Amino acid sequence: MGAVRRKELVIERGEDVWVWDDAGKRYLDATASLWYCNVGHGRPEIAAAVAAQFKQLEAYSAFGDFVSPVAHELADTLADLAPMPARIFLTCGGGESIDTAAKIARRYWSAQGQPDRTLLISRTGGYHGTNGYGTALAGIPANREGFGPQIETVQVPHDSLEAVAAAIEGAGAERVAAVFVEPVIGAGGVYPPLPGYIEGLVEICKRSGVLFVADSVICGFGRLGSWFGVERFGVEPDMITFAKGVTSGYLPLGGVVVAEHVAAPFWQAPGGPVLRHGPTYAAHAACCAAAIANIELLGRDGLLTRGRELEGALHDTLKPLASDGKVAEVRGGVGTMAAVELSAELLDSRPTAIGEVVMAAREQGVLVRGLGRGVAVSPPLTATAEHFGLVHDALALALSRL
């Protein structure tokens, strides 16, 4: 907080891939805000849908037997889009979705007569929000520090199937509730999975009877070229968390896609297990209207598949930066997500280098995000190769100034 005191960049308006600050300067939004503005800024279709919903019903509780027609419609739509037979639990964002999935996993095993299955496994570099369970699952050490004792979790190396199997065996499968995995690690540095990794992980979970949770908060709704991102690996998770791109950030909404077999215990006759959990604003009517309109745009405008169509162009455009001695690696190639990692020598000798690159790019009218050991790029799905070129040029100039 102190680091940005009196130094805020005030973003005043947006249109497509562009945003403007309060001084009128235009910037290329090369991060889709915070990984979420998939359809681009200023879409009138979403604004109109939300306005119409506000005129009819702004919101009403979804607790107990209450529901709104628009929430029903969204849940039905999401269930139809899911890669497995499923039910939908709506939340207000990604962090709530992670907490919800974690609680469902633990409550599911309790309902199955296995209450000791509470341990959760995640990966180094993984990001799962900053709520209670998400903080405990964090594979980014800085996100866990300073908060005292947390929920018991185990982090394993992000690229090792052997480490996952060993962690389950070491803890005892009878104690492990679920493994949480981003299809592509996002905030931890943009690490696409090794070939066969996701498929192998699902097999390990099946053999061990452990639930597999795909955290698709960043990867969904076109970012990897499909509705939930994980479909491109040909697997059926036990749960999928989503948020961000489901509304393109126009209003806050998230949720969990829960496979039928995981949801089943909670749909028994009265007297069966109860999942006592739910955010106040879950299934908010106006937010649901935004999501429905956004999903329609993704399909109508051909944006859903853009993440996969553009992944090669984005990576190829940025890859020449790797020839700069100040760059260790350019990662990407799976969806419209990429990272330019700075060299260890540079970071050791110049700890402020990442911030300097971010600010130099900003001076050139390009917004990138510093994270991990470099900067990330994740533009709206309406971006083009020309926009990728602007990102490359801004980063090249920024690197030349170090």
Provide a role label for each language-model segment.
Residues 1-402:
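Conserved N-terminal phosphate-binding loop of PLP-dependent enzymes in the Aspartate aminotransferase
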